[in-house]
Regions:
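Extended, low-polarity segments enriched in aliphatic/aromatic residues
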Residues: 1-129
Length: 129
């Protein structure tokens, strides 16, 4: 777990190196939300429905808004997540990502990003239909 937390902190630091002092705008398409990082070759079917597009000048607010939107969704049936939830002894973390990959420690990245000044986890969500 310590190595994962360290990796997530480094990821935030590398992101800061890219955006610090430069104008930037970020767009996230929250679709085909897989159980593992997109970089994993062994990925499975999406665990959540497609949510939409998010955009912000603050990359951290954007990430937090995307996470929050995902956590409000009902997991897709017959996905790795719902299969795990149906198993006897399932430990519900009340977080789709922690339920799918408990050791990912994704919140560490967001917390560290805020601590080092990439942006704020606070946001105002404006919905456009």
């Amino acid at each position: 777990a310590a190595a994962t937390k360290d990796f997530n902190c480094r990821m935030a630091e590398y992101a800061k190196a890219v955006v610090d002092g430069r104008p930037n705008f970020h767009i996230s398409l929250v679709v085909d939300i897989s159980p593992n990082c997109d970089c994993h070759f062994e990925n499975d079917a999406p665990i959540l429905p497609n949510i939409g597009m998010f955009a912000s000048f603050d990359p951290l607010a954007l990430d937090q808004a995307c996470v929050d939107a995902c956590l409000k969704q009902t997991p897709l049936p017959n996905s790795q997540l719902t299969d795990a939830m149906a198993k006897e002894g399932f430990c519900d973390h009340h977080d789709h990502f922690e339920n799918t990959t408990p050791n990912a420690e994704y919140k560490t990245c967001l917390e560290h990003a805020e601590k080092i000044g990439i942006g704020s986890r606070d946001y105002e969500l404006i919905t456009i239909s």
